[in-house]
Amino acid sequence: PDLKERYGYGGFVHLEHHRTGCARMMRDDHFFREVGDNCWSPERRLEDCDRDGVTVQVLSTVPVMFSYWARPGDTDDLARLLNDDLAGSVAVNPGRFVGLGTLPMNAPDLAVQELTRCVRELGFAGVQIGSHVNGLNLDAPELFPVFQCAAELGAAVFVHPWDMLGAGRMEKYWLPWLVGMPAETAVAVCSILFGGVLERLPDLRIGFAHGGGSFPHTIGRIQHGFEVRPDLCAVDNQVGPREYLGRFYLDSLVHDQAALRYLVDLVGADRIALGSDYPFPLGEHAPGALIESLDDLAEEGRNRMLWGTAEEFLGLEPGRFLP
């Protein structure tokens, strides 16, 4: 639908189909990016999956569509539209697709309702949320009921960076995606840990995109800061961040063998799931290739990262999708 017409104001993303199999993502009259039909066509996605040897793909909303900035009721309405559309794709191909819904996180009460609908009515494995909500970090008390609901439902929560910090200084060189996203994800991880969300909800299954961003690679600095300035870092939770390593999930999308080996050493292969960022340029164009390239990785660890960890994180029956 025309979202500007539907809600009475602009700022929403829409597609301009300017040629076959291709569209421009536009925010009002401003160009955002060009995308192919694998962004909206399940059939095209399955063709790519078959080409790349991907048995199952997890579907989620493009983060630019989160629209947390909009009026709460409108964000909720849009989330329902997006989730219903995604559920339709999963329903037609239940052996190939798994769904993660989107939520109106700018209205936590509505987010709880939509999360419940996503799991109980639409059959989704969980939800994808942004790294912050209009400047509120994920430890904000207002957001806690959403995480609590996810834990109670046994739903996975996947955190993806969006609306990156420092945007005004990063207009050149694609820096929001190259530098801003890893930093944004690190802020999200630290907010969850320092804020005590996992301490209060030990059963919450939460994962972070892009290998946890810069967090894993600065854990020494973060832990040291926690120890030397508890007056600043331990104000909401007295448990150090290192104690939580292995209690949350990361994906494997780090683009570098040494970085992936480091993640395996840090959190274990059983906490790392294959991440592809399909179908965008920063994704892994041959999903799983980096994992497969680690010759020194035991078969058990490789299988965990290729499919086993994802099954666990998403709460899927082990071996459900194996031939």
State what each model feature region is.
Residues T55-G195:
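Active-site gating/metal-coordination segments in enzymes
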Residues P1-D37, M164-T185, I222-L245:
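Active-site gating loops and adjacent loop-to-helix segments of metal-dependent hydrolytic enzymes
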Residues Y68, A167-W174, G212-E227, L260-V267, ...:
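Histidine/acidic-residue-rich catalytic or RNA/ligand-binding cores of hydrolases
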Residues P1-V56, D84-V92, Q113-R117, L204, ...:
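Mid-to-C-terminal alpha-helical segments outside catalytic/metal-binding sites
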Residues L193-G196, R200-L245:
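Aromatic-lined glycan-binding groove of carbohydrate-active enzymes
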Residues G36-W40, S67, M105-A111, N134-P141, ...:
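Acidic-and-aromatic substrate-binding clefts and catalytic sites of carbohydrate-active enzymes
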Residues P1, H160, H210:
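Histidine-centered divalent metal-coordination motifs
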